[in-house]
């Protein structure tokens, strides 16, 4: 797959990601709706995806992609015809929606929905620079969450930043290859934090699903100075369980 070709990724790679998430979750509906290509060298060189956006650098900030407000709103957005900045404009007919509006409302009001990223290296070499770390959701408290808005030309999104805490525990998968994929839970409406509207942490309900995982690229002190650049792609998938 030519990951620098926008149309090719939507046509050929999105279905692969949907199949991976569907197999992992058993969900009834999985639809990929957005992606980012990341490379420090590509960002510096202002590399651009054919038919799409510029290549982004690794995100060196602890964050979660969605909030109590923006997660359900993003699904509702995907149940409407795509707007100017919606990636799936390239695969939908005029007036077509990615998700069924009635099904989305049922999932939000009384069912279960999630947003899951499929993160993968696309370089020939294993990841050595700017690897991705994920925070244990059971060690995050509601007071650690800081909402920040992202203003697009056609909508306003919300992410979470994290307040630093000695409670946090971090994990990463070293030397990931292009034959491996990491599924990152960006939101799960069945998580305890989500179900209590942010009043209680996921740790208050051990054994239940977590709501989301903070994540960030980081500088590994063990990385050799001549290590190759990380090139990765993440694809966001909307997941409806019912």
Question: Where are the regions that the model predicts?
Answer:
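Catalytic core of Fe(II)/2-oxoglutarate
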Residues: 156-242
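Non-heme Fe(II) oxygenase catalytic core, chiefly the N-lobe of the double-stranded beta-helix
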Residues: 1-159
């Amino acid at each position: 797959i030519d990951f620098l070709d926008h149309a090719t990724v939507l046509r050929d790679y999105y279905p692969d990601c949907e199949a991976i998430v569907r197999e992992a979750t058993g969900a009834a509906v999985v639809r990929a709706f957005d992606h980012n290509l990341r490379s420090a060298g590509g960002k510096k060189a202002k590399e651009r995806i054919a038919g799409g956006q510029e290549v982004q650098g690794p995100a060196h900030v602890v964050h979660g992609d969605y909030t109590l407000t923006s997660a359900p709103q993003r699904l509702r957005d995907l149940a409407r015809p795509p707007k100017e900045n919606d990636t799936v404009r390239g695969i939908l007919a005029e007036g077509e929606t990615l998700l069924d509006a009635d099904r989305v409302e049922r999932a939000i009001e009384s069912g279960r929905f999630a947003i899951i990223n499929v993160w993968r290296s696309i370089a020939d070499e294993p990841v050595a620079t700017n690897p991705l770390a994920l925070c244990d959701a059971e060690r995050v408290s509601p007071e650690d969450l800081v909402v920040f808005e992202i203003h697009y030309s056609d909508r306003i999104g919300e992410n979470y930043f994290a307040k630093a805490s000695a409670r946090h525990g971090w994990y990463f998968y070293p030397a990931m290859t292009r034959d491996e994929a990491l599924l990152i839970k960006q939101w799960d409406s069945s998580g305890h934090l989500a179900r209590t509207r942010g009043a209680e942490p996921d740790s208050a309900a051990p054994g239940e699903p977590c709501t989301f995982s903070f994540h960030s690229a980081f500088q590994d002190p063990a990385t050799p100075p001549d290590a190759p650049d990380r090139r990765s792609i993440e694809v966001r998938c909307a997941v409806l369980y019912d």
